[in-house]
């Protein structure tokens, strides 16, 4: 039973929050506003040739947005610094504590680049869309700006607004362009995500108004507040539910297979490549960074939930006969490594979680794009209705094989590096007992073993075996076209590049991750040596080494012994 007594504050904010580096040019504001403005210009583009002009316009906006984020990284971001960079701050509604505050550090900058990169490829993947193309590309571009804002804003109320901004485009993309059960999938998505978002708003208001006076919702201010341990635990629990839906964490995951089961290929890429990463990013930014004492006590729970994700989703994926749902559960399984990395008090493990988000964003987008391309040819998602198409689609088979090998963490691919970092980081983390580390690592290894089994068997059922006569006679099994090869090639370049030389990515966020882990480690040390005002009994952290409990009462025999 937890006693929510208020503890003395963890006064580390001033030491660990480095000075902000102001932007020499409003790169981040431009990267947020440019695609949104472009989205509102889409309705004015002449609609001729089944939306051809609209496609080129949307692709141009997405590419320019990507170039803006690249320029921000090259000309305004220093990977060696751990603090906030590219900082922009404009007072908006000072009486309400609302400020337009954006910036980037190692936790957010790689994800900003990933967002703009995946979105540009998703626009190219949407080239065959001819039904209401103006509305489709309007939603894609608006979603681009909203997702970049999620990673760039430095104000918790702005974060909530950006978090909500991307919900409506996803809902409409599912409800209008989805499959037969699109209304069900879209409604389930909006209920899960919008309902859980209420916790973000409540926590933002509670933290912003903490201590009275003029509210302030900026991250740098919140990180230096004297939040008591009980208050942190309540906020942490609420945020864990909200972000756990988006990650997703089992059992808050059921919206994802339904959404993926009905989405089109470009929407698949945005869901798997970006949307899930918002949950992992938010856990790092808010739960781990702003609520360090609560994170130190919830961390073992995150690790257990991560193992549940890995094993449960891998077993469920193995049993799926629908191709989209199989890959969807595979995504849930891989995101379990993110939870384990965030729950570790190791810089290596947390860095591995960050790399796993980036790696899965690339690999997940590639796999789901191939699912869409395969469906366009076979017009079925049931594995038992496929088979024997490898001879007719050799290039497609080669693309599938490489991407599947990347997903099962083949050495030389980014997934291998990220999962290895999480494993080694957690296994060498002395914050947990040796028994706990062995059990968790052993259970997680089961998921690693299951992954190649269900992925390779999936390839066998799609491309090998006897040809389905009905499938061959009623479909046009043409091989991959240049556009499809180009999209997969663009995704494979960073996947293989990071796998061969991980520092291409890890150097961009190592300094920020080290600062984050240092802050959480100080909170952990404080829990190990609690003061009289701290929580007396924390049942959530049985695995933490040397977490002494305060003596509450003494028996008569103990008192006589001491005398």
UniProtKB/Swiss-Prot annotation:
Membrane-spanning intervals of the chain: 25-45, 56-76, 90-110, 111-131, 133-153, 157-177, 189-209, 230-250, 264-284, 298-318, 335-355, 356-376, 397-417, 438-458, 485-505
Classification via PANTHER family: NAD(P)H-QUINONE OXIDOREDUCTASE CHAIN 4, CHLOROPLASTIC (PTHR43507:SF21), NADH-UBIQUINONE OXIDOREDUCTASE CHAIN 4 (PTHR43507)
Keywords on record: Membrane, NAD, NADP, Plastoquinone, Quinone, Thylakoid, Translocase, Transmembrane, Transmembrane helix
GO molecular function: NADH dehydrogenase (ubiquinone) activity; ubiquinone binding
Protein location: Cellular thylakoid membrane
GO CC annotation, single: plasma membrane-derived thylakoid membrane
Gene that encodes the chain: ndhD
Family: Belongs to the complex I subunit 4 family.
HAMAP family listed in its UniProt record: NDH1_NuoM
NCBIfam families named in the record: NDH_I_M, PRK02546.1, PRK12561.1
Lineage: Bacteria, Bacillati, Cyanobacteriota, Cyanophyceae, Synechococcales
Record's bilayer topology term: Multi-pass membrane protein
One GO term (biological process): electron transport coupled proton transport
Catalytic activity: a plastoquinone + NADH + (n+1) H(+)(in) = a plastoquinol + NAD(+) + n H(+)(out); a plastoquinone + NADPH + (n+1) H(+)(in) = a plastoquinol + NADP(+) + n H(+)(out)
Main location: membrane
Known role: NDH-1 shuttles electrons from NAD(P)H, via FMN and iron-sulfur (Fe-S) centers, to quinones in the respiratory chain. The immediate electron acceptor for the enzyme in this species is believed to be plastoquinone. Couples the redox reaction to proton translocation (for every two electrons transferred, four hydrogen ions are translocated across the cytoplasmic membrane), and thus conserves the redox energy in a proton gradient.
Name listed for the protein in its UniProt record: NAD(P)H-quinone oxidoreductase chain 4
E.C. numbers: 7.1.1.-
């Amino acid at each position: 039973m937890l006693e929510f007594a208020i503890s003395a504050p963890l006064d580390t904010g001033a030491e660990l929050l480095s000075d902000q580096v102001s932007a020499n040019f409003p790169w981040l504001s431009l990267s947020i506003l440019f695609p949104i403005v472009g989205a509102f210009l889409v309705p004015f583009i002449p609609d001729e040739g089944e939306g051809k002009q609209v496609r080129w316009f949307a692709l141009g906006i997405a590419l320019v947005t990507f170039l803006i984020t690249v320029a921000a990284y090259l000309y305004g971001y220093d990977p060696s610094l751990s603090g906030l960079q590219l900082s922009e701050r404009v007072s908006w509604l000072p009486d309400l504590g609302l400020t337009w505050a954006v910036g980037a550090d190692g936790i957010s900058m790689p994800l900003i680049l990933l967002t703009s990169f995946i979105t540009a490829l998703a626009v190219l993947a949407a080239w065959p869309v001819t039904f209401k193309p103006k509305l489709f590309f309007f939603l894609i571009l608006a979603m681009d700006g909203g997702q970049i804002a999620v990673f760039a804003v430095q104000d918790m109320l702005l974060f909530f607004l950006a978090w909500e901004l991307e919900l409506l485009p996803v809902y409409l993309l599912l409800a209008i362009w989805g499959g037969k059960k699109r209304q069900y999938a879209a409604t389930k998505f909006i209920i899960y995500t919008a309902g859980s978002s209420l916790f973000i708003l409540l926590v933002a208001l509670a933290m912003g108004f903490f201590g009275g006076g003029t509210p302030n919702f900026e991250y740098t201010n919140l990180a230096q507040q004297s939040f008591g341990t009980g208050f942190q635990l309540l906020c942490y629990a609420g945020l864990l539910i909200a972000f756990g839906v988006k990650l997703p964490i089992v059992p808050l995951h059921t919206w994802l297979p339904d959404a993926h089961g009905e989405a089109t290929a470009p929407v698949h890429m945005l869901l798997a490549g970006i949307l899930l990463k918002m949950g992992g990013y938010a856990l790092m930014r808010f739960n781990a960074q702003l609520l360090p004492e609560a994170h130190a006590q919830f961390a073992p729970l995150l690790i257990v939930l991560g193992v549940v994700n890995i094993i449960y989703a891998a077993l469920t994926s193995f049993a799926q006969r629908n191709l989209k749902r199989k890959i969807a559960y595979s995504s849930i399984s891989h995101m379990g490594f993110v939870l384990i990395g965030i729950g570790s008090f190791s810089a290596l493990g947390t860095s591995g979680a960050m790399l796993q988000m980036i790696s899965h964003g690339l690999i997940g987008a590639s796999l789901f794009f191939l699912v869409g391309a395969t469906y366009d040819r076979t017009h079925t998602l049931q594995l038992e209705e496929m088979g024997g198409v490898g001879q007719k689609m050799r290039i497609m088979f080669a693309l599938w094989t490489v991407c599947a090998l990347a997903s099962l963490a083949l050495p030389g691919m980014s997934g291998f590096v990220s999962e290895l970092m999480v494993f080694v980081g957690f296994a060498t983390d002395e914050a947990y007992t040796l028994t706990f580390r062995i059990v968790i690592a052993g259970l997680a290894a089961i998921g690693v073993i299951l992954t190649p089994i269900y992925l390779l068997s999936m390839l066998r059922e799609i491309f090998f075996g006897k040809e389905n006569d009905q499938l061959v006679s009623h479909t046009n099994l043409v091989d991959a076209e240049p556009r499809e090869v180009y999209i997969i090639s663009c995704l494979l370049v960073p996947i293989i590049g990071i796998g061969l030389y991980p520092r291409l990515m890890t150097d961009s966020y190592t300094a920020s991750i080290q600062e984050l882990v240092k802050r959480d480690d100080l909170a952990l040390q404080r829990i190990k040596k609690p003061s009289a005002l701290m929580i007396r009994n924390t049942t959530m952290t049985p695995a933490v080494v040397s977490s002494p409990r305060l003596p509450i009462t003494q028996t008569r025999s103990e008192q006589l012994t001491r005398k």
